[in-house]
């Protein structure tokens, strides 16, 4: 549905141009929710605005719904943009128009007949749960309701793609969950392809099928959300995940491990960080490892979460025993689908 090929984008700057995007390659499949996450200034907004050519890339090609946007004339590009809806962080509603009229605006500008506009807007307001507020003005509704108006307006022309530019970052957590739930419902009910950018890994966790991590204008990692959570490869990804699934051990735990090392240096053991997902999360693997390999195992830290219906868990464990048994235990865990990260106790 969307393909970005070797995209670079620079802005004028002094003493040298600012490189916002560098060699970006992305492919978004039809009907999926694709997230792009990164810190402030990483290039997220620049990237999403390249998709509909609000930012024209300095280099590369943009393909959306079978058309190469970067090769289109101005008039053909305007027509192609009808296939791409967009919602924004600050809603961008017209304060002088009612909820109904804000949603109707793109249809009016396209010359749609009034009777068809009324039918389409009624349908959309029902979809986003705002039929009762149709005559209200933006100043009379909440932030979450304003974003629902923005979503309805973005869907007015029946686009194939919806772009979400930090659409929930100005909302409280409960309203954010509600808006993300609405986007997921629209995606599932209508097969709409959604690309959303965010700096919050919680948003990715709740709604995205796949995710790309952007850092300093480059895509540093991408994949299925469950895979990225369980097998993060890049330091930026690990730090973003750590914000919602912290891995830092309490100082009291670190002190206890070091005391064990000092008391029994010949059995100082090993610190393992384990990540598991799906069916593996329900299997009694640790008790099996203890029995099979004769190890002492102490759980230091752990948590279990849910990523769109898939159980995901992480554990930090201190394992002590013979070196050969430790090696075999790690191999056994990995063969069972557990992601195992070995750490030196001295570096904890």
Curated annotation (Swiss-Prot):
Its EC number(s): 7.4.2.11
Amino acids binding ATP: 38-45
Membrane topology: Peripheral membrane protein
Classification via Gene3D superfamilies: 3.30.70.260, P-loop containing nucleotide triphosphate hydrolases
Keyword Cell membrane: yes
Pfam families for this protein: ABC_tran, NIL
Record has Protein biosynthesis as a keyword: no
Catalytic activity: L-methionine(out) + ATP + H2O = L-methionine(in) + ADP + phosphate + H(+); D-methionine(out) + ATP + H2O = D-methionine(in) + ADP + phosphate + H(+)
Function: Part of the ABC transporter complex MetNIQ involved in methionine import. Responsible for energy coupling to the transport system.
Quaternary structure, from the entry: The complex is composed of two ATP-binding proteins (MetN), two transmembrane proteins (MetI) and a solute-binding protein (MetQ).
Protein name: Methionine import ATP-binding protein MetN
């Amino acid at each position: 549905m969307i393909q970005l090929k070797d995209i670079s984008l620079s802005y004028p700057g002094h003493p040298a141009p600012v490189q916002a995007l560098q060699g970006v390659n992305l492919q978004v499949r039809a009907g999926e929710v694709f997230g792009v996450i990164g810190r402030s200034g990483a290039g997220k907004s620049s990237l999403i605005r390249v998709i509909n050519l609000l930012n024209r890339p300095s280099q590369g090609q943009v393909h959306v719904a079978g058309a190469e946007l970067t090769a289109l004339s101005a008039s053909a590009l305007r027509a192609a943009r009808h296939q791409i809806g967009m919602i924004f962080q600050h809603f961008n509603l017209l304060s002088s128009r009612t909820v109904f009229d804000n949603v109707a605006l793109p249809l009016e500008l396209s010359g749609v007949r009034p009777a068809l506009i009324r039918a389409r807007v009624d349908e959309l307001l029902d979809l986003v749960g705002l039929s009762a507020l149709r005559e209200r003005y933006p100043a009379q509704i909440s932030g979450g309701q304003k974003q629902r108006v923005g979503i309805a307006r973005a869907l007015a022309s029946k686009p194939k793609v919806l772009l979400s530019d930090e659409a929930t970052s100005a909302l409280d957590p409960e309203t954010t969950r509600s808006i993300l739930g609405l986007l997921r419902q629209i995606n599932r009910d209508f097969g709409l392809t959604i690309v959303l950018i965010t700096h919050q890994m919680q948003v990715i966790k709740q709604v995205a099928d796949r995710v790309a991590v952007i850092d300093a204008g480059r895509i540093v990692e991408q994949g299925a959300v469950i895979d990225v959570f369980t097998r993060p490869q890049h330091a930026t990804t690990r730090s973003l995940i750590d914000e919602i699934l912290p891995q830092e051990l309490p100082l009291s735990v670190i002190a206890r491990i070091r005391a064990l090392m000092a008391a029994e240096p010949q059995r100082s053991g090993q610190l393992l960080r384990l990540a598991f997902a799906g069916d593996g999360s329900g299997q009694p693997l640790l008790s099996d490892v203890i029995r099979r390999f004769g190890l002492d195992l102490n759980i230091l830290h752990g948590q279990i979460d849910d990523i769109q219906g898939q159980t995901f868990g992480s554990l930090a464990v201190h394992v002590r025993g013979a070196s050969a048994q430790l090696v075999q235990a790690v191999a056994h865990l990995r063969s069972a689908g557990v992601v195992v990260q070995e750490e030196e106790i001295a570096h904890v």
